[in-house]
């Protein structure tokens, strides 16, 4: 059995956090890999916004700048056989899972070489080869879908786990409660990860959620629930490690609430006046990227030169994917009728 303490500890930021017994600490190579994934998200996010400003992309974009730590510290623990189900603000989850950037960008740009032949766009991406199973624009729907993959893993007798990513607003959707209940009853190997950035679209957390910590809701469904510092890679890693090991051992699901903050509005270009200047300043101060970079340097895990070289390599990877996507063709008119019905509809 994997043991979890029953008491809550308060971190320096007042975040409720429970530490799993035998807290896992990533080795040096794993810490650098977490940072690599974080930088991959940040560079991809920044260059996406640049392309939108230049008018080269016209699709809606939901930035996750500030939330890089969460999927990076989780994905480093997953195999390609392990699956993720995410939401419209989920490109960072896919990038952290090491989804190839060329087909990702081709899909974002609506090109035929995209993961969904240009029909899905940035809100409906998939790449089963790396375990990216579904991106959904329906709030809360990633969780029951994840249960389906968890049930399949049980039937197949594998050790696969599925991670369901969602936001704090989705914790108030009926699908959240139904999914957690079923996952607990059937002991599904699913980890429910709430990326709590404090806002449900434009609504403050406290104006739409009845509990101070979403993780408390896990108790009602007989599963462990933990609120962790979503800006601390080592905290996320330790809790995700325990949750994943528990799931692989057949002991069922875990709810992880990762407290964080998104630097931008709900959708790129919207008015974020509902965020105060003080909140934005505090978020930038708590930016996980420079903090973790400095920690790696201070601890002797990597040098500044090594991390700069890694960043340059990743930026080149993103730029290559952009150039590739822009050179791809748009889908033909005939493609509109494909992948819609079981039998192809004649023109």
Question: In which residue ranges do the predicted regions lie?
Answer:
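Glycine-rich ThDP/TPP pyrophosphate-binding loop and its adjacent helix/strand module
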Residues: 132-327
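Cofactor-binding active-site loop characterized by glycine-rich and histidine/acidic residues
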Residues: 46, 50, 54-186, 204-210, ...
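A broad, low-specificity signal marking well-ordered, structured residues that form hydrophobic/aromatic
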Residues: 7, 123, 254
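Conserved acidic/glycine
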Residues: 2-70, 258, 268-273, 277-347
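N-proximal short alpha-helices
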Residues: 21, 115-119, 256, 265
């Amino acid at each position: 059995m994997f043991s979890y303490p029953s008491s809550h500890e308060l971190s320096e930021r007042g975040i409720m956090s429970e530490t799993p017994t035998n807290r896992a600490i990533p080795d040096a190579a794993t810490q650098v890999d977490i940072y690599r994934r974080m930088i991959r998200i940040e560079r991809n996010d920044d260059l996406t916004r640049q392309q939108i400003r230049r008018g080269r992309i016209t699709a809606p974009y939901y930035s996750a700048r500030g939330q890089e730590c969460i999927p990076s510290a989780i994905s480093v623990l997953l195999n390609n056989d392990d699956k993720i189900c995410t939401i419209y603000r989920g490109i960072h989850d896919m990038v952290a899972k090491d989804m190839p950037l060329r087909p990702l960008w081709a899909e974002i740009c609506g090109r035929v070489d995209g993961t969904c032949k240009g029909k899905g766009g940035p809100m409906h991406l998939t790449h089963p080869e790396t375990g990216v199973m579904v991106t959904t624009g329906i709030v809360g729907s990633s969780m029951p879908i994840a249960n389906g993959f968890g049930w399949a893993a049980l039937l197949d007798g594998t050790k696969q786990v599925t991670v369901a990513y969602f936001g704090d607003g989705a914790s108030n959707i009926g699908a959240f409660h139904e999914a957690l209940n079923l996952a607990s009853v059937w002991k599904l190997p699913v980890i429910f990860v709430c990326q709590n950035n404090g806002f449900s679209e434009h609504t403050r957390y406290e104006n739409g959620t009845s509990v101070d910590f979403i993780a408390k809701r896990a108790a009602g469904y007989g599963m462990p629930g933990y609120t962790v510092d979503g800006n601390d890679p080592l905290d996320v890693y330790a809790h995700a490690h325990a949750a994943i090991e528990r799931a692989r051992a057949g002991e069922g699901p875990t709810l992880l609430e990762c407290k964080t903050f998104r630097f931008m509005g709900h959708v790129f270009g919207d008015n974020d006046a509902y965020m105060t200047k003080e909140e934005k300043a505090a978020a930038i101060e708590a930016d996980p990227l420079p903090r973790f970079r400095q920690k790696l340097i201070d601890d002797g895990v990597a040098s500044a030169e090594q991390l700069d070289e890694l960043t340059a390599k990743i930026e080149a990877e993103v730029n290559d994917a952009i150039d590739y996507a822009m050179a791809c063709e748009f889908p033909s008119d005939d493609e509109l009728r494909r992948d819609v019905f079981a039998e192809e509809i004649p023109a």
